[in-house]
From Swiss-Prot:
Binds 2 magnesium ions per monomer. It comes from Buchnera aphidicola subsp. Acyrthosiphon pisum (strain Tuc7). Pfam families: Glycos_trans_3N, Glycos_transf_3. Its cofactor is Mg(2+). Pathway: Amino-acid biosynthesis; L-tryptophan biosynthesis; L-tryptophan from chorismate: step 2/5. GO terms for molecular function: anthranilate phosphoribosyltransferase activity; magnesium ion binding. Catalyzes the transfer of the phosphoribosyl group of 5-phosphorylribose-1-pyrophosphate (PRPP) to anthranilate to yield N-(5'-phosphoribosyl)-anthranilate (PRA). This is Anthranilate phosphoribosyltransferase.
Amino acid sequence: MRNILLKIYDSKFLNQEESYQLFTLISSGKITDIKLASILTAMKIRGESIEEITGAIKAFLDKMKYFPKPDYIFSDIVGTGGDAKNTINISTMSAFVAATCGLKIIKHCNQRISSKSGSSDILEKFNINLNASPEKSRKTLDQLNICFLFAPKYHDGFKYSNNVRTDLKTKTIFNFLGPFLNPATPPLSVIGVYNKNLINIAVNILKNLQYKRAIVLHSDNTDEVTLHGTTYVSELLNKKIISYQLQPESFGLKMHPKKILKINSLEENYHIIKEIMKGKGSKLYEELIAVNVAMLLKVFGYENLKENTKLALNKIRSGDVYKHIRNVANMLKEDNHARHNT
């Protein structure tokens, strides 16, 4: 351990195994707060390497609680957050639309970081029980194509660093781990990053973690596809990485003028999303969700982005997505009821 610390303090990079050892200790509560603060600060100042981040991810994955992973193909869709845009929860709603289209989605979700409402906050507004048992979550996935795994329920190891991270009041390596810590370890994923410079880092981490196919994207300082400019993409397929750019026309849509789509509260976010999922939302919001669903369909092998977008728009405008959300909530509510009666 001493050699690992000396390397960090000398601004030298750890290899993947050294990082794994370090974060295994951190996730076990065996590093003091003052030492942890110095480690995180030193790593942040010199920048964290792909190998260091991969080692940290593997350490936390090895300590997570069990989830009954399915044999069939499934995906996650997640954003890093941290863009401070306070927009609606695009990835969460895209997951529901994708499930309504027939895709299997296991969404890893957490509490808000920099937005007015994180994925868990909005899910609770829709009465989605985030404390469902792993078995019930798996059953919901089998029958309704989607389930949500709440990070604090599956990852105990983060509790040992919470106080230090709060006190530091700055982004650290921890802020980048979430999208890679899905307890179901999916073979597919779509990840949005808040900074264009993070695309290459994220896609190479996915390669290190042996994802079958994945997309990392960024557009206009947000962690999602936008409709007023260029979306930058790196795609992992068969251990090879390709990079390309997309425009709204790539999805068969027209360019929208740039608009501020900020929401001011959880209640406002919920109301906007509810109307969209009922098929009564604004055209801009419908299309914004649809293009992100199109990318999710792509990792499942549906290569035509224009057709993918049409399919997603049809599902959104039909109102079927809201019915699907209600069905998921009702199924998980049964589990909640059973727990209260045991």
